[in-house]
Amino acid sequence: MKVSAALLWLLLIAAAFSPQGLAGPASVPTTCCFNLANRKIPLQRLESYRRITSGKCPQKAVIFKTKLAKDICADPKKKWVQDSMKYLDQKSPTPKP
């Protein structure tokens, strides 16, 4: 029994000091979009947005947050998405990255 406990303890220590364990904030999961909205979202429903440009995601996207706290993924190449981002930038006092 002591051998099993010692082996378990050793495995836990090894996992804690592995490169993935030491990675810190970089190992935080990234939000990715797999389905993009096809229809324009009414501007009155939008509250904010963020861009998804991580190399870990299969595609670049914009995630709009609605006033009802829903996240909606959209294609940043679409004109309505660019217009919506511009609208939110003008509405917001702080610029988006």
UniProtKB/Swiss-Prot annotation:
It is found in: Secreted. GO terms for cellular component: extracellular region; extracellular space. O-linked glycan consists of a Gal-GalNAc disaccharide which is modified with up to 2 sialic acid residues. One of its GO terms (molecular function) is CCR chemokine receptor binding. Keywords: Chemotaxis, Cytokine, Disulfide bond, Glycoprotein, Inflammatory response, Secreted, Signal. PANTHER family: EOTAXIN, SMALL INDUCIBLE CYTOKINE A. In response to the presence of allergens, this protein directly promotes the accumulation of eosinophils, a prominent feature of allergic inflammatory reactions. Binds to CCR3. This is Eotaxin. It comes from Homo sapiens (Human). The gene is CCL11.
